Amino acid sequence: MSELNMTPREIVAYLDEYIIGQKEAKKSIAIAFRNRYRRLQLEKSLQEEITPKNILMIGSTGVGKTEIARRIAKIMKLPFVKVEASKYTEVGFVGRDVESMVRDLVNNSVLLVENEHKEKLKDKIEEAVIEKIAKKLLPPLPNGVSEEKKQEYANSLLKMQQRIAQGELDSREIEIEVRKKSIEIDSNVPPEILRVQENLIKVFHKEQDKVKKTLSVKEAKEALKAEISDTLLDGESIKMEGLKRAESSGVIFIDEIDKIAVSSKERGRQDPSKEGVQRDLLPIVEGSVVNTKYGSIKTEHILFIAAGAFHLAKPSDLIPELQGRFPLRVELESLTEEIMYMILTQTKTSIIKQYQALLKVEGVEIAFEDDAIKELAKLSYNANQKSEDIGARRLHTTIEKVLEDISFEAEDYSGQNVTITKELVQSKLEDLVADENLVKYIL
């Protein structure tokens, strides 16, 4: 169920394991992602005519907007990038221009393809690494030795490789040659400046220069993996595949789009990160060509999902042209006390399970009574009502507060079973939640 051809029903069933409620949002997104698969099954001429139906998600923070898109992109192995609209400025002003989100998507896509190729060659890479380390640990075979000696050496090399693979020699130190670390390049600068940076690096920094390092066998394995991967992988085909995948099935999630909406009260004020950014977004969303360090990419088949709380502005405050580029609108529901409880008990990797796993490392077995979980949900919901509504994120803060002392003194509880009761939850949280002046301290 981890392939691109998941049906909408399968996508929603998968999302239900991690996100409670929001049926309409899940349904709309599932259809949008399935349509990408359907489009790829058509003949080329028709593929070009079908563009994705971009989605605008409306809902307060912490209700699952980002998580829905991120989870689908992950299970379907699609290039995905999440950006915040408020971080961009209009072209001509100091700051990031909107085209950099497309370059970020291409970078993620190339990395995704590279990791897939590495996974396919995993065994081959490990064999090459182990063989190289084994030859370093064994003294070299002199020239002109007999066939018998050669066979003995081959047997010794094989035994050495087996010991290295099993981790028996991980602590032994060896001297190996590794490539110098390459200089990091800022990919968010325009392509022209990027090319200048790359040329300067070629002049002042030879990537093939190697340095000798003394490392443990365990460290040497990791150091050599990256080097041997580069020699076995076809870099050019990976770049081309990454570029193509970003172009045909990439997803850009634009969060906080409401922050660049200009309400009627603000109209007339100069703000380079608002209406100007919307106008810069237009050509990218409707389809244009963006230059990246891997080549040019057309954006017309990239799926754009915009999201915002729209507390201070309305979707209609976005410029009409941009509104038209997001034809599908989904409103996400605020979280109720019941949904808060279900998030804690029914999700596959619930916060409770996460904390239980973390404390189990210290030998502490944590159990939550059902009444305690209900109280956590109730107090978290009340805190959201009295202060800023931050949705499910409130649960992280309240559980952290309840388990704070146990986490701090974990070694004292090692080997014990600790039960979290309703009374414990109340003693840790109720005095804070009850006081509206103090509730702001529960972030």
Language-model-detected regions and their locations in the chain:
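Non-catalytic accessory segments flanking P-loop/AAA+ NTPase cores
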Residues: 1-443
